[in-house]
């Protein structure tokens, strides 16, 4: 078998092995959101701040969404910065890019960071009194997965929260 045939077969094998995962829409009426995950997410619930966590993996990539409720009048930017710092520092990392963003008119931040072994992106929004934190993580040194955008850009609110 020629070298070009071996290369073609290897490429075909790898393309099949790493074929795109069919992402699934996940809706939480209690959380008032919809997002796509690479598989049905695992769910955890905490008691503090009505904390809810949803997570799923696609190979070495990890995707998650957490939401928590804060008292009315909470300084949203302070909360977002605290969450950003906690996650980035937890990975022994540093922020390499940060931008203000929004979801349906509610303020947020998009953050890209690199840690000791992990690189990732965060999208954090403050909607009324609720914080939504989306994360996408991959091993450090791998090219940015296209799935990061698939996940982070899929987040939508089901309805405007009551004031």
Predicted regions and their residues:
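Surface-exposed amphipathic alpha-helical segments
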Residues: 29, 39-42, 80-91, 132-163
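A short acidic-to-branched-hydrophobic micro-motif
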Residues: 53-81, 133-135
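Solvent-exposed coil/turn segments that connect beta secondary-structure elements
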Residues: 31, 59, 68-70, 116, ...
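Bacterial N-terminal signal peptides
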Residues: 5-16
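N-terminal secretory signal peptides that target proteins for export/translocation
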Residues: 1-2
């Amino acid at each position: 078998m020629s070298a070009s045939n071996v290369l073609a077969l290897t490429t075909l094998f790898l393309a099949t092995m790493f074929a795109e995962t069919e992402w699934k829409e996940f809706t939480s009426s209690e959380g008032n959101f919809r997002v796509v995950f690479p598989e049905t997410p695992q769910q955890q619930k905490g008691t503090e701040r009505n904390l809810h966590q949803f997570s799923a993996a696609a190979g070495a990539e990890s995707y998650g969404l957490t939401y928590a409720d804060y008292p009315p009048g909470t300084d949203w930017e302070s909360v977002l910065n605290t969450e950003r710092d906690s996650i980035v520092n937890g990975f022994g990392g540093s922020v390499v890019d940060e931008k203000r963003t929004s979801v349906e008119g509610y303020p947020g931040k998009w953050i890209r960071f690199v840690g000791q072994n992990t690189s990732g992106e965060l999208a954090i929004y403050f909607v009324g009194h609720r914080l939504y934190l989306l994360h996408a993580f991959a091993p450090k040194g791998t090219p940015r997965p296209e799935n990061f955008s698939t996940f982070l850009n899929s987040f939508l609110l089901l309805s405007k929260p009551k004031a």
